[in-house]
Structures are given as C-alpha cells and as structure tokens.
C-alpha cells in the first residue's frame, strides 16, 4: 500500500511539473533580452501590418509563463505616424531558445493583460 501511494504521489508530481505555470512578473524589465523581445515584436508587427508602422521605444512592463519554452506578455511603448505619437501596445511572444523559435502570438493597441 505504501509503495502504491508513493508511486501515485511521484506520478502526480511529474504530471504537475509538465503543466504550464501561471503568469509571473518579469523581474528585470530592463534586461537586454526583454528589450530585444519588445523590439522584435514591433518589427514583426510592422512586417505583417505595414500600414501603421511603429517605432520601438521600450518595454515598460510584462509577465512571463513557463511552457514548452516561454510565453511573454509585454507592455511596449512605441511611436506611430513617423514618431510623433507614442502609445502603449501589448504583445504576446512565444520563445523557445533551444530551437531558435520565436512567434508573435498577438499584438494589440488596446491590450488588457
């Protein structure tokens, strides 16, 4: 009986370790990698939506989530209209460093994280 209980407990722990975690605040928003992700998100958005080209200023906030890689929810300050008008944008970026994968999951002017 004790062996069965330990086996079930071990199985539960392993299963929990494989599940995605909740979102947690990015500890150092000024980290060069985080700023690069924000710059990349703006560049990628400009590529798929060239009608309203944005200029990256900086990442101002965000959260991260461990999955099979990492999801990032970023609050990005950027300028539109040739740099005259700045605004806050939201981007969700998936990154898997070991496979060199990066995807822009969503991008929104009126983000609600």
From Swiss-Prot:
Keywords: Plant defense, Protease inhibitor, Secreted, Signal, Thiol protease inhibitor. GO terms for cellular component: extracellular region. Residues 1-18 form the signal peptide. GO terms for biological process: defense response. A motif (Secondary area of contact) lies at residues 65-69. It comes from the Eukaryota. The record marks 22 as: Reactive site. Pfam families: SQAPI. Its main location: secreted. Specific inhibitor of cysteine proteinases. Probably involved in the regulation of endogenous processes and in defense against pests and pathogens. This is Cysteine proteinase inhibitor 6.
């Amino acid at each position: 009986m004790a062996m069965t209980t330990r086996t079930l407990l071990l199985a539960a722990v392993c299963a929990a370790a494989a599940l995605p975690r909740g979102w947690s605040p990015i500890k150092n928003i000024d980290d060069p990698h985080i700023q690069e992700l924000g710059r990349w998100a703006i560049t990628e958005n400009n590529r798929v939506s060239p009608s309203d080209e944005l200029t990256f200023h900086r990442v101002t906030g965000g959260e991260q989530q461990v999955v099979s890689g990492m999801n990032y929810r970023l609050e990005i300050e950027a300028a539109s209209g040739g740099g005259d008008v700045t605004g806050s944008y939201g981007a969700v970026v998936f990154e898997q460093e070991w496979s060199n994968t990066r995807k822009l999951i969503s991008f929104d002017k009126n983000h609600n994280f």
